[in-house]
């Protein structure tokens, strides 16, 4: 039976970077668990800001967080008050010097994670799942994506038996490593239970320029 590999993990080192970039010789497990908790808590705390991803770097005894968000103003706050408050809280918790970089997501309509969270939010507000899926797909295509697939799973419309439905428009070359495919997952907590939302967004191919070796000069010699 065929299974689908995670599109992000499949392309790590090819056209996708690691989201935790550090190495230590001891206490690796503790720092890894700390990374997971930090990412989870920041996503929950900054839910209104539309956080797409949180990347972690640990240069020396410092902690650097790179937050990609659709609404950076909510995180920064007036005159930087909110981000300073967040930084102080993290420094107190981790006992490290913390640096926070905020990167704006220019087109949230093409970000798979934000699309999944938006659909989940609509499902929690009792919007029909087909309508929510179609609206997200139409919006992504309008902003220039080459292909998009949305899949929802669970007790759709409150049915007794859980099922999955999906909607696909355009191309989605999952086996092509150079394809820039973004993947997102979110959960909608409804009165009937949890509905899972998965999105795949194909934004085109990434071609890496090959390094050209200098060629020897070609000439003619007359003896």
From Swiss-Prot:
Pfam families named in the record: KH_2, Ribosomal_S3_C
Subunit structure: Part of the 30S ribosomal subunit. Forms a tight complex with proteins S10 and S14.
Swiss-Prot/TrEMBL GO biological process terms: translation
Name recorded for this polypeptide: Small ribosomal subunit protein uS3
GO molecular function: mRNA binding; rRNA binding; structural constituent of ribosome
PANTHER family the record matches: 30S/40S RIBOSOMAL PROTEIN S3, SMALL RIBOSOMAL SUBUNIT PROTEIN US3C
Organism: Acidobacterium capsulatum (strain ATCC 51196 / DSM 11244 / BCRC 80197 / JCM 7670 / NBRC 15755 / NCIMB 13165 / 161)
Keyword Ribonucleoprotein among record annotations: yes
GO annotation, cellular component aspect: cytosolic small ribosomal subunit
Function text: Binds the lower part of the 30S subunit head. Binds mRNA in the 70S ribosome, positioning it for translation.
Entry keyword RNA-binding: yes
Residue ranges of domain KH type-2 in the record: 38-106
């Amino acid at each position: 039976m065929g299974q689908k590999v995670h599109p992000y993990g499949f392309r790590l080192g090819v056209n996708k970077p690691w989201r935790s970039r550090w190495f230590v010789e001891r206490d690796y497990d503790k720092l890894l668990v700390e990374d997971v908790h930090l990412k989870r808590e920041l996503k929950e705390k900054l839910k209104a800001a539309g956080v797409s991803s949180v990347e972690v770097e640990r240069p020396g005894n410092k902690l650097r967080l790179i937050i990609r968000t659709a609404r950076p103003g909510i995180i920064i706050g007036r005159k930087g008050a909110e981000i300073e408050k967040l930084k102080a809280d993290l420094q107190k918790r981790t006992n490290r010097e913390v640096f926070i970089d905020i990167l704006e997501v220019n087109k949230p309509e093409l970000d798979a994670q934000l699309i999944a969270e938006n659909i989940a939010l609509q499902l929690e507000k009792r919007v029909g799942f087909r309508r929510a899926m179609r609206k997200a797909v139409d919006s992504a295509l309008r902003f220039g994506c080459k292909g998009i697939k949305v899949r929802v799973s669970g007790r759709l419309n409150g049915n007794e038996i859980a099922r999955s439905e999906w909607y696909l428009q355009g191309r989605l070359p999952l086996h092509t490593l150079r394809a820039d495919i973004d993947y997102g997952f979110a959960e909608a907590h409804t009165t009937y239970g949890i509905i899972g939302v998965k999105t795949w967004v194909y934004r085109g191919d990434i071609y890496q320029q090959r390094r050209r070796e200098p060629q020897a000069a070609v000439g003619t010699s007359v003896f």
